[in-house]
Amino acid sequence: MKTDGGNTWRASHSKPLNTANTMGEPFSHSEYSVHADQSEFYLNELTEHSGQDNPCMNTSRLNTNRYGHPVVHPCPKIHCICTQSNIAAIGSDCTGCVDIAQACKMLRGGLGCTQDPCVKNPHTQCFTDVSNHAMRNVLPLNVSNTEQFPIQIEYANGRNPVLNPMDDLAMRAALLLSKDIDLQNTHILPSTRISIEKNIPVAAGLAGGSADAAAVLLGINSAWQTNYSRCDLLGKAGALGADVPFLIWGGAAYGSGTGSCVTFFETQTLYWVLCFSKHPLSTRKVFQELDRQRSGAGCNHHPVFSNPAECAEMLKKAIKRGPEALAALLHNDLTSAAKMLMPEIAERIKAAERCPGILRAIISGSGPTLALLAEDAEAANRACSILKDTGVICKAVSSPAYSSIYWQT
């Protein structure tokens, strides 16, 4: 992230656990920063949110920028900041949807903060260091003031994983906002070019494209000053895919319907190992195979999640009890379809669950990446080392990550 001059506002967004038969994948995380004076807009996509929690900061380092937003000057190692002012803003955006005090409590608990929630004082800070264990895509977005209004997507390595530009979720996210703007009644919007340096595996079940789409919605909303609320963007995100709304908010949550109905959970930090495959798996083909399997006999619905009304409450209780209780509920309806298309997944799951301290292994999203829930951080790191010795490409991560935003001058 460039910090030399200009007003900057920056946010990070991540997905919750995929503990039910939802269409979402866990662990993807996107963040953006906009340099208004320099007209440069950067997005980073991460696969996790991890690190040692830092104590709450006082308000002595805070003031406001020209837009009246809180300004902070964090340690260079701090990648994510959670402010009570942002939670208050979420509350005002979602009147009746979010209890501000409860949201503050949820954020504080996840970040290990011991300070009492402060709704009246919007400048109370909680910091968390996520400088370690990061895997990220970098997306510079260049904005220029011209009378043209093109939106260009290019890939830094010269290889676009999406053959049809209109299938690119980042492009679709940008176009989604541009369609709502009446250029006759507003200033001419700048031309926009996004260059994506892809580091997260494509077609891996990690929602990399969806994370980019969510960050583009939030980032362009700021860069173009379209002033949509977070709830407005939540509704728009659902049009891009059922998993994109997760990334607008972050945290741990249960999504139902088309993904726009989200129930948030308070949760302790959970430790995982992501095991990657050398070969991609098409989401479209996995769902086609699932449809084929469900059209005949032997439809494999998980009984625990057959009643959506009870699912959120069951997950909430399990998460509070700890990883062992949560492991008993982990299930992915796409598993049988993914195994049919890539039979080696079955053996990979068995090998992973033989590692000491691994409670459960499931496929992430539509696969083929596996998500291994560990007892604790030590077990996750130990399993990661064991699997690496057998040639498995893997990474120890933690969850959940929280949606946050800050401004810096």
Swiss-Prot record:
Top-level taxon: Bacteria
Protein name: 4-diphosphocytidyl-2-C-methyl-D-erythritol kinase
Biological pathway: Isoprenoid biosynthesis; isopentenyl diphosphate biosynthesis via DXP pathway; isopentenyl diphosphate from 1-deoxy-D-xylulose 5-phosphate: step 3/6
Source organism (scientific name): Tropheryma whipplei (strain Twist) (Whipple's bacillus)
Leader peptide range in chain numbering: none
Biological role stated in the UniProt entry: Catalyzes the phosphorylation of the position 2 hydroxy group of 4-diphosphocytidyl-2C-methyl-D-erythritol.
Start and end residues of each stretch annotated as Disordered: 1-26
Coiled coil residues, start to end: none
EC number: 2.7.1.148
Lineage of origin: Bacteria, Bacillati, Actinomycetota, Actinomycetes, Micrococcales
